């Protein structure tokens, strides 16, 4: 007898709901239990997937993130000079852009690494993953670095959006990807600035 697809284990990218089955379903990180700790008290005993296998792979990732951030700033410097009809140096733009670019690069690299490591471990399993249907065309606007961090990188809906993009790009063909716009209550809302 062939099992129903709903019997397959699920991978939760964001907060678990009441249908979560401990020992059957997977969660990508501890953030999946925020506000649900009492409902699922054994969450603290789950071994979550790390983005890095060891200190060496973490060191390599740091170097790669730094190189990527530098190349992004070079591209942005040219674009911003043209847009504002200026001829500021790379160093000028570096000073202004390194913090948000490096912070974003590290965030994305870690999320990509976590998913990539998880896929290596579970690529043969018939998982079900519910993802955010939005694409890169979605607009997320941030006023400054603080807004980027609080309303983007630390925002549950934004994290779910980014993880969904990565999953949609990397998921093995054994996984069933289900798009839904109702996974998070604030999924269709733009972030509300937390800082003036």
Q: PLM features: what roles do these ranges have?
A:
Residues 1-196:
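Catalytic-core helical/loop segments in enzymes performing group transfer/polymerization on anionic/lipid-linked
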């Amino acid at each position: 007898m062939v099992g129903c697809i709903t019997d397959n284990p699920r991978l939760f990218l964001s907060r678990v709901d009441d249908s979560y089955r401990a020992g059957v379903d997977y969660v990508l990180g501890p953030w999946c239990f925020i506000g649900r700790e009492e409902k699922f008290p054994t969450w603290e005993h789950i071994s979550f997937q790390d983005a890095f296998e060891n200190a060496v792979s973490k060191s390599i990732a740091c170097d790669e993130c730094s190189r990527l951030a530098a190349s992004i700033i070079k591209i942005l410097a040219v674009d911003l000079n043209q847009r504002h009809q200026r001829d500021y140096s790379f160093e000028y733009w570096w000073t202004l852009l390194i913090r948000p670019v490096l912070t974003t690069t590290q965030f994305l690299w870690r999320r990509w690494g976590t998913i990539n490591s998880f896929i290596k471990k579970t690529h043969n399993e018939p998982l079900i993953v519910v993802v955010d249907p939005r694409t890169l065309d979605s607009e997320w606007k941030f006023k400054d670095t603080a807004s980027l961090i609080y309303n983007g990188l630390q925002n549950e809906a934004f994290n779910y959006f980014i993880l969904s993009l990565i999953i949609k790009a990397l998921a093995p063909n054994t996984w069933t990807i289900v798009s839904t716009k109702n996974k998070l209550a604030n999924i269709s809302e733009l972030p509300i600035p937390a800082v003036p």
